[in-house]
Amino acid sequence: MKPHRHQNKNLTLCGNYSLVIALMASKTEPLPVAEQRRMTGRLLVGLEDMAKSANPGLDSWRDLADCMNWLESAVEMGWVDDADGAVEAAKAALLDGHSNANKHGKLRMSGPSLVGMRNMVEQFGELLQVMTARNYWTVVGTGEKRVSAIWRGKKKAGDVVVTL
Protein backbone atom coordinates (compact mmCIF):
# COMPACT_ATOMS: atom_id res chain seq x y z
CA MET A 1 0.00 0.00 0.00
CA LYS A 2 1.33 3.41 -0.96
CA PRO A 3 1.86 5.79 2.01
CA HIS A 4 -0.11 9.00 1.96
CA ARG A 5 1.65 12.34 1.68
CA HIS A 6 0.16 13.60 4.92
CA GLN A 7 1.31 10.68 7.07
CA ASN A 8 3.71 11.69 9.82
CA LYS A 9 6.94 9.79 9.28
CA ASN A 10 8.74 10.47 12.55
CA LEU A 11 12.06 11.07 10.76
CA THR A 12 13.51 13.28 13.45
CA LEU A 13 14.42 12.10 16.90
CA CYS A 14 12.83 15.01 18.77
CA GLY A 15 9.68 15.32 16.67
CA ASN A 16 8.40 18.11 14.48
CA TYR A 17 7.43 21.33 16.23
CA SER A 18 3.84 22.44 16.07
CA LEU A 19 2.39 25.35 18.01
CA VAL A 20 -0.64 23.22 18.88
CA ILE A 21 1.56 20.45 20.31
CA ALA A 22 3.56 23.00 22.29
CA LEU A 23 0.46 24.69 23.70
CA MET A 24 -1.18 21.38 24.61
CA ALA A 25 1.96 20.08 26.34
CA SER A 26 2.00 20.01 30.12
CA LYS A 27 3.50 22.98 31.95
CA THR A 28 4.17 20.91 35.05
CA GLU A 29 4.92 17.33 33.93
CA PRO A 30 7.77 16.01 31.79
CA LEU A 31 7.17 14.08 28.57
CA PRO A 32 5.51 10.69 29.05
CA VAL A 33 7.94 8.00 30.17
CA ALA A 34 7.24 5.94 27.04
CA GLU A 35 8.29 8.86 24.84
CA GLN A 36 11.42 9.44 26.91
CA ARG A 37 12.35 5.76 26.59
CA ARG A 38 11.70 5.82 22.85
CA MET A 39 14.06 8.74 22.34
CA THR A 40 16.84 7.56 24.63
CA GLY A 41 16.54 4.02 23.26
CA ARG A 42 16.85 5.32 19.71
CA LEU A 43 19.95 7.29 20.71
CA LEU A 44 21.53 4.29 22.42
CA VAL A 45 20.87 2.13 19.35
CA GLY A 46 22.46 4.83 17.19
CA LEU A 47 25.46 5.03 19.49
CA GLU A 48 25.83 1.24 19.41
CA ASP A 49 25.55 1.35 15.63
CA MET A 50 28.35 3.92 15.44
CA ALA A 51 30.53 1.83 17.75
CA LYS A 52 30.07 -1.71 16.45
CA SER A 53 28.22 -1.87 13.15
CA ALA A 54 30.15 -2.89 10.04
CA ASN A 55 28.56 -0.01 8.15
CA PRO A 56 26.86 2.50 10.50
CA GLY A 57 23.63 3.92 9.16
CA LEU A 58 22.87 7.50 8.28
CA ASP A 59 19.77 7.44 10.51
CA SER A 60 21.93 6.77 13.56
CA TRP A 61 24.12 9.76 12.73
CA ARG A 62 21.04 11.95 12.17
CA ASP A 63 19.53 10.96 15.52
CA LEU A 64 22.74 11.85 17.33
CA ALA A 65 22.94 15.13 15.40
CA ASP A 66 19.31 15.94 16.34
CA CYS A 67 20.15 15.35 19.99
CA MET A 68 23.20 17.60 19.75
CA ASN A 69 21.16 20.34 18.06
CA TRP A 70 18.46 20.07 20.75
CA LEU A 71 21.03 20.38 23.53
CA GLU A 72 22.75 23.28 21.78
CA SER A 73 19.42 25.10 21.49
CA ALA A 74 18.66 24.49 25.17
CA VAL A 75 22.10 25.88 26.11
CA GLU A 76 21.62 28.95 23.88
CA MET A 77 18.26 29.60 25.53
CA GLY A 78 19.96 29.50 28.93
CA TRP A 79 17.81 26.63 30.20
CA VAL A 80 20.70 24.16 30.39
CA ASP A 81 24.19 24.68 31.75
CA ASP A 82 26.90 23.05 29.67
CA ALA A 83 29.84 23.46 32.05
CA ASP A 84 31.41 20.15 31.02
CA GLY A 85 31.28 21.00 27.29
CA ALA A 86 29.02 18.12 26.24
CA VAL A 87 27.71 20.03 23.22
CA GLU A 88 31.16 20.86 21.87
CA ALA A 89 32.35 17.29 22.51
CA ALA A 90 29.31 15.95 20.64
CA LYS A 91 29.89 18.38 17.79
CA ALA A 92 33.53 17.23 17.55
CA ALA A 93 32.39 13.58 17.61
CA LEU A 94 29.94 14.15 14.76
CA LEU A 95 32.65 15.90 12.76
CA ASP A 96 34.94 12.93 13.49
CA GLY A 97 32.32 10.59 12.04
CA HIS A 98 31.93 12.84 9.00
CA SER A 99 35.68 12.97 8.35
CA ASN A 100 35.87 9.17 8.63
CA ALA A 101 33.01 8.91 6.14
CA ASN A 102 34.95 11.09 3.71
CA LYS A 103 38.21 9.16 4.22
CA HIS A 104 37.01 5.56 4.55
CA GLY A 105 33.40 5.62 3.35
CA LYS A 106 32.00 4.67 6.79
CA LEU A 107 30.45 6.86 9.48
CA ARG A 108 32.72 5.44 12.14
CA MET A 109 33.60 7.34 15.34
CA SER A 110 36.79 6.95 17.36
CA GLY A 111 36.89 5.99 21.06
CA PRO A 112 37.06 9.53 22.52
CA SER A 113 34.25 10.60 20.19
CA LEU A 114 32.07 7.75 21.41
CA VAL A 115 32.69 8.78 25.03
CA GLY A 116 31.64 12.35 24.19
CA MET A 117 28.49 11.11 22.47
CA ARG A 118 27.62 8.82 25.39
CA ASN A 119 27.93 11.76 27.80
CA MET A 120 25.62 13.80 25.59
CA VAL A 121 23.04 10.98 25.44
CA GLU A 122 23.13 10.62 29.24
CA GLN A 123 22.69 14.38 29.70
CA PHE A 124 19.77 14.37 27.24
CA GLY A 125 18.10 11.49 29.12
CA GLU A 126 18.48 13.30 32.44
CA LEU A 127 17.02 16.49 30.99
CA LEU A 128 14.00 14.65 29.60
CA GLN A 129 13.18 13.44 33.11
CA VAL A 130 13.16 16.90 34.69
CA MET A 131 12.17 19.33 31.92
CA THR A 132 8.48 20.00 31.44
CA ALA A 133 6.87 18.91 28.19
CA ARG A 134 6.09 22.54 27.30
CA ASN A 135 9.73 23.54 27.73
CA TYR A 136 10.84 20.51 25.73
CA TRP A 137 8.67 21.55 22.78
CA THR A 138 9.82 25.16 23.08
CA VAL A 139 13.41 23.99 22.71
CA VAL A 140 12.42 21.85 19.70
CA GLY A 141 10.84 24.89 18.03
CA THR A 142 13.84 27.08 18.79
CA GLY A 143 16.16 24.41 17.41
CA GLU A 144 14.16 24.13 14.20
CA LYS A 145 14.31 27.91 13.74
CA ARG A 146 18.06 27.89 14.41
CA VAL A 147 18.73 25.10 11.90
CA SER A 148 16.48 26.78 9.34
CA ALA A 149 18.43 30.03 9.74
CA ILE A 150 21.70 28.13 9.23
CA TRP A 151 20.37 26.62 5.99
CA ARG A 152 19.41 30.14 4.85
CA GLY A 153 23.02 31.21 5.41
CA LYS A 154 22.68 32.97 8.78
CA LYS A 155 25.46 31.19 10.65
CA LYS A 156 26.74 32.14 14.08
CA ALA A 157 30.22 31.48 15.41
CA GLY A 158 30.57 27.76 16.05
CA ASP A 159 27.84 26.65 13.64
CA VAL A 160 28.93 23.78 11.41
CA VAL A 161 27.06 22.44 8.38
CA VAL A 162 27.77 18.87 7.34
CA THR A 163 26.20 17.14 4.36
CA LEU A 164 26.41 13.39 3.84
Please provide the spans of the model-predicted regions.
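Compositionally biased, intrinsically disordered low-complexity regions used as flexible
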Residues: 1-3, 50, 98, 158
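Short Lys/Arg-rich cationic patches that frequently serve as NLS/NoLS or arginine-rich RNA/DNA-binding motifs
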Residues: 1-17
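Short amphipathic alpha-helical heptad-repeat segments
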Residues: 13-17, 32-43, 59-67, 110-116
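Short, flexible domain-boundary/linker segments around small modular repeats
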Residues: 20-55, 81-108
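Residue-level detector of alpha-helical secondary structure
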Residues: 44, 48, 65-68, 72, ...
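Extracellular/lumenal glycan-associated surfaces
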Residues: 55-76, 107-127
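HEAT/armadillo-like alpha-solenoid scaffolds in large eukaryotic assembly and transport factors
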Residues: 78-84, 131-136
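Amphipathic alpha-helical binding modules
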Residues: 101-164
